[in-house]
């Protein structure tokens, strides 16, 4: 679905009469084996190795199928007299990027969707509402999360999402994506989670 959506977006900026989206040869057994391998790893809250664009597409399809019933994913905190450590992302192979943001009370970040990006949110300090809406649908799902009990919310592709600081103190959120940010190809499309008038 993501490749088809990208082909439609690309078609808007070309004069070509015929466009052929990229394809990958595989078998039903190959797809089943990949999905099984991904689920075995993902069931533990970890990110499986995504070797090819087809792997990314299949993993995004699996995540969409599991959403929202699979979320939030609880995280284990390891505490001692120094404080606590929480492993938020364990990725099997590949590249990725982790970053942290702070958000003032009442402020919302996001209001966009992705076609291929695998993205994970973990609130590590403060309180927030993470809201998501599937493209072309009206229903909005809200997850109320807190840094006191960190959980994982992964953003499915083709779901508009945002995060709002609902607390009275600064919100600290850790994000992980499976790709390094590329300003020339950000895979980020603006759209509000709650359109005006809804």
Task: Outline where the language-model segments fall.
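Mid/C-terminal beta-alpha module of Rossmann-like enzyme folds, strongest
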Residues: 1-75
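Double-stranded beta-helix
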Residues: 94, 103, 123-125, 135-139, 160, 164-198
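A generic "binding-loop/recognition-motif" signal
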Residues: 116-117, 149, 159, 169
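A short glycine-rich, His/Asp/Glu-containing loop-to-beta-strand
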Residues: 71, 76-111
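Short acidic-glycine-tyrosine-enriched beta hairpin
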Residues: 134-158, 164
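A short beta-loop-beta micro-motif enriched in histidine and acidic residues
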Residues: 94, 107-120, 147-148
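Glycine- and acidic-residue-biased ligand/ion/polar-headgroup-sensing regions
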Residues: 116-134
